[in-house]
């Protein structure tokens, strides 16, 4: 199946909501529920009006059957949302510490269980919208400091990062191209021993007086066989004359 290029780079909002449903939330069951073993987690025995933490997708299913009541997260209380909004206004270069899927969870609770909120749903919805707008404005300002290596995105939510991803990736790729185009090639400097051209010109030489070039150590050679030594002529003649005296005369060997 062919998919548009823009959908390959980012997630759809529906996909992020689907992933957010794997997070857990507290509920108050209205009926007794038997424990259930699931692939990712095990659900304990549920008692009426006793808090249990379950995946959001199960809480949605139980809520539609009127078998439970949502317990909204603490950060979704009106007082906490106002405190988060004040922090966002007072700190133009920092983000408040909220849940990674805070936008998705807020929309799920406002859509599925608005009657379980401690404040009017419209007040909570307006506060969430104001917080999102302030954080979005600050994230756009932070994109001016992006470079080809990294972009600091501490305390940003999944939906916020997903909205910035196409612009950040494209900007970093262009910066990498500019850096590669402006980078000059540095000359390679060889040392005297590392130059490969010198190795090609080197030829073996013979006849050196160095003892390392001899196949036999010089200590085992007679002094007359060393390079550069000469034997006394008179001594050589004396040895030849002694050898001639010992050689038998021509005419046949002596028995």
From Swiss-Prot:
It comes from the Eukaryota. Residues 194-204 have a biased composition (Acidic residues). SUPFAM superfamilies: GINS helical bundle-like, PriA/YqbF domain. Residues 187-255 are annotated as: Disordered. Keywords: Chromosome partition, DNA replication, Nucleus. One of its GO terms (cellular component) is GINS complex. Residues 227-241 have a biased composition (Basic and acidic residues). CDD domains: GINS_A_psf2 (cd11712), GINS_B_Psf2 (cd21694). It is found in: Nucleus. GO terms for biological process: chromosome segregation; double-strand break repair via break-induced replication; nuclear DNA replication. InterPro entries: GINS_A (IPR021151), GINS_bundle-like_dom_sf (IPR036224), GINS_Psf2 (IPR007257), PSF2_N (IPR056784). The GINS complex plays an essential role in the initiation of DNA replication. Has a role in chromosome segregation. Component of the GINS complex which is a heterotetramer of SLD5, PSF1, PSF2 and PSF3. Belongs to the GINS2/PSF2 family. PANTHER family: DNA REPLICATION COMPLEX GINS PROTEIN PSF2 (PTHR12772:SF0). This is DNA replication complex GINS protein PSF2. It comes from Yarrowia lipolytica (strain CLIB 122 / E 150). The gene is PSF2.
């Amino acid at each position: 199946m062919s998919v548009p290029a823009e959908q390959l780079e980012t997630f759809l909002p529906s996909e992020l909501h689907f992933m957010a449903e794997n997070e857990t939330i507290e509920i108050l069951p209205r009926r007794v529920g038997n424990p259930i073993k699931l692939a990712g987690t095990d659900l304990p025995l549920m008692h009426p009006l006793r808090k249990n933490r379950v995946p959001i997708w199960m809480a949605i299913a139980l809520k539609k059957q009127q078998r439970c009541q949502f317990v909204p997260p603490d950060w979704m209380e009106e007082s906490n949302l106002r405190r988060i909004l004040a922090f966002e206004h007072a700190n133009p270069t920092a983000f408040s510490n909220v849940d990674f899927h805070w936008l998705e969870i807020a929309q799920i609770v406002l859509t599925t269980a608005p009657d379980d909120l401690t404040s009017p749903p419209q007040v909570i919805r307006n506060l969430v919208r104001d917080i999102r707008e302030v954080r979005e404005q600050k994230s756009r300002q932070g994109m001016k400091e992006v470079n080809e290596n990294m972009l600091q995105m501490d305390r940003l939510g999944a939906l916020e990062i997903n909205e910035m991803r196409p612009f950040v990736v494209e900007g970093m790729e262009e910066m990498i191209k500019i850096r590669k185009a402006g980078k000059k090639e540095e000359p390679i400097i060889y040392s005297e021993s590392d130059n490969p051209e010198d190795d090609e010109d080197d030829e073996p030489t013979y006849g050196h007086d160095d003892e390392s070039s001899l196949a036999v150590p010089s200590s085992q050679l007679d002094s007359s066989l060393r390079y550069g030594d000469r034997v006394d002529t008179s001594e050589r003649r004396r040895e030849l004359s002694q050898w001639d005296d010992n050689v038998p005369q021509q005419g046949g060997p002596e028995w």
